[in-house]
Amino acid sequence: MADLITVARPYAEALMGWRKRAARNRPGRMHCRRLPAMIADVQAQAFLTDPERRDAEKVSLLSAVPVAVDVKAWKAFLALLIHNDRWPATAEIGTLFADAMRRAEGVVDVLVTSAIALDAGQKTAVQSALERRFAGHKVRFREAVDAALIGGLVIHTGDLTIDASVRGQVQQLARTLRS
């Protein structure tokens, strides 16, 4: 199967479109969390991969997840996932949908990875720079440590990665020297 994020993107976008068009009872984050949790169950996976089961039975299983949305539309969405054999991508669909919801609400999730833990002053400086970079959005800052970076930072949000690490600079130099 193709990369799950690539497979999941159009389904997450469809959910966002549905959310934007619906006046009320819109799909929310909770619906996209419950479904992957159900699919993670070994028995559910066995049921969904059973070639003897009809698509309607599989949709019936997945639609047992309680939702506060238009049930007919939700079942149609689930039927599409089943028919196209995209149900394994539900976790990624949920993640992408939640990301899109946060963006629509003006929130940008940023993961900042450094070689050593940032002190309070460094965190403040990075947070300020990110808020300037993503003006008009609330920046939700998460931090990780990866000693393999040697020094510097790697900033990741959505499709954007800024690699200002020593490791990244060394790798770039190596690529330049090879070409």
From Swiss-Prot:
InterPro entries per the UniProt record, alphabetical: ATP_synth_OSCP/delta_N_sf, ATPase_OSCP/d_CS, ATPase_OSCP/dsu
TM segment ranges: none
SUPFAM superfamilies: N-terminal domain of the delta subunit of the F1F0-ATP synthase (SSF47928)
Keywords: ATP synthesis, Cell inner membrane, Cell membrane, CF(1), Hydrogen ion transport, Ion transport, Membrane, Transport
Pfam families, alphabetized: OSCP
Coiled coil, from the record: none
Gene3D superfamilies, A to Z: N-terminal domain of the delta subunit of the F1F0-ATP synthase
Keyword Transferase annotated: no
Topology within the bilayer: Peripheral membrane protein
Subcellular localization: Cell inner membrane
Highest taxon listed in the record's lineage: Bacteria
Any one of the GO CC terms: proton-transporting ATP synthase complex
A single MF term (Gene Ontology): proton-transporting ATP synthase activity, rotational mechanism
Subunit annotation: F-type ATPases have 2 components, F(1) - the catalytic core - and F(0) - the membrane proton channel. F(1) has five subunits: alpha(3), beta(3), gamma(1), delta(1), epsilon(1). F(0) has three main subunits: a(1), b(2) and c(10-14). The alpha and beta chains form an alternating ring which encloses part of the gamma chain. F(1) is attached to F(0) by a central stalk formed by the gamma and epsilon chains, while a peripheral stalk is formed by the delta and b chains.
NCBIfam families in the cross-refs: ATP_synt_delta
Family: Belongs to the ATPase delta chain family.
Record's function text: F(1)F(0) ATP synthase produces ATP from ADP in the presence of a proton or sodium gradient. F-type ATPases consist of two structural domains, F(1) containing the extramembraneous catalytic core and F(0) containing the membrane proton channel, linked together by a central stalk and a peripheral stalk. During catalysis, ATP synthesis in the catalytic domain of F(1) is coupled via a rotary mechanism of the central stalk subunits to proton translocation. This protein is part of the stalk that links CF(0) to CF(1). It either transmits conformational changes from CF(0) to CF(1) or is implicated in proton conduction.
Name of the protein this chain belongs to: ATP synthase subunit delta
Taxonomic source organism: Acidithiobacillus ferridurans
Organismal lineage: Bacteria, Pseudomonadati, Pseudomonadota, Acidithiobacillia, Acidithiobacillales
